[in-house]
C-alpha cells in the first residue's frame, strides 16, 4: 500500500482473446521484448488471472498454479484401399484404422505426462471423419482424426514418436483382425483362404514430404506454394483444414498408393511451462508463491500446484529451446509460417516463469458457469498483489 516507496515496474497487458488462439498474447510477446530493451527492464515472471475450478467432484480446494499445461494436436491422415461394399475384404477401410487409433490413444493414460506427481489428462479426439464426399457403395479411401494432447514434459518430437508407435500398433491390430475375420469368412463360405496383403505403415509428414521431394524435386515445393496461395484466398478457412489440404495434395503426388498413415501436427500449439526451480527466476517465483500462500489468512484451503490444467496465454511466455523439439514442430505442421505462425524465437528470448492466480468458479464453458464471489474478489486479488510486492523485494 506504500506506493511512494514502491520499487519496480508492472507491465499490464489486456489480452482478452485466449479462446481465439491467444492472438492478444502472441502479439504482446515481441512488444515485451522491445520494452525490455528500451526501458532496460529485468522481467521476473508473468502472472495470469485465468479461471480456476474444482479438479474433481467435491473438491473445495483453491489452487495457485506455478506453470502451465501444454497442448499439441497430433493428426492422422489415413489412406486405405477402396473396395466394393459387396466385396469388402478386397480393401482396407481407413475408418477401421481410425477407430483402432482412437481405441489405442483416446483417454489412454499411457500417453499422460507425469511430473512431480501431477498427471496430465490423457489425449481425447476432437475430430474423426472419412473424407468421402458423396454416397456410393464404394468404401472410403481416406479418413483423418486429431487429438487434443496435453503435455507437462513431452516435447513435440517426443509426442510424435509416441503417437507414431501407437498408430503402428493400431494399424497392425486392424490387419491382424482383418486376417482373422477373413479366415473365418472363408471357412464359413468354403472359399480358399490367403493371407491379406496389407502392411502397417506409419510415417511423419516430414518423411512423406522428403519421399515426394525425391521423386518430384522442386515440383512439390511449387505445389505447396500454389496451394498456399489458393487456400489463403479464403480468409475463413479453418487452420486444421488448411493443413489437411496440404497433406492430401502432397500424398496425391506420391507414386506409392499403398495404405499408409501420415502423422502431423495441426494448429494450435501451446508449449507447457514447467517451473522446476532450475534457475534464479524460477526459484524466486516458487519461493515467493509458496510463502504468500502459506501466510495468507483465509477460510479456504489454498494449494500450490505445478501446472495450470487448461490451455492458457501463459504458454507463450517461453518456448522449448531444444533444437529437435522446435524442428519437429515446424517440419511436421503443414502451413506453419503461412496460415499459422508463432513467434517462437521471441518466446525463447522472453523465457519467463509463470503463475496463474485466478478467480474460482464452477461449470466453465456451460450456461451455468459461475464464480464464488468471496474468494474471487477478496482473496485472489490479495494473492496477486502480495506476489507482485514480494517478487519486487
Name each region found by the language model.
Residues 37-245:
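Midchain, well-structured core segments that form catalytic/ion-binding scaffolds
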Residues 26-29, 95-106, 381, 385-389:
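Predominant activation on well-ordered alpha-helical scaffold segments within soluble catalytic domains
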Residues 15-21, 51-54, 130-132, 267-270, ...:
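Short, internal active-site loops enriched in acidic
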Residues 183-393:
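An extended, acidic, His-containing surface patch that forms the Zn2+-binding/catalytic region
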Residues 1-67:
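Acidic/histidine-rich catalytic neighborhood of metal-dependent amide-processing enzymes
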Residues 10-16, 46-48, 126, 261-265, ...:
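Extended hydrophobic secondary-structure segments that form protein cores and membrane-embedded regions
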Residues 21-23, 84-88, 154-158, 272-274, ...:
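A generic structural signal for short coil/turn motifs at secondary-structure boundaries
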Residues 3-5, 64-71, 135-141, 253-256, ...:
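Short glycine/proline-enriched loop/turn "hinge" motifs that connect secondary-structure elements
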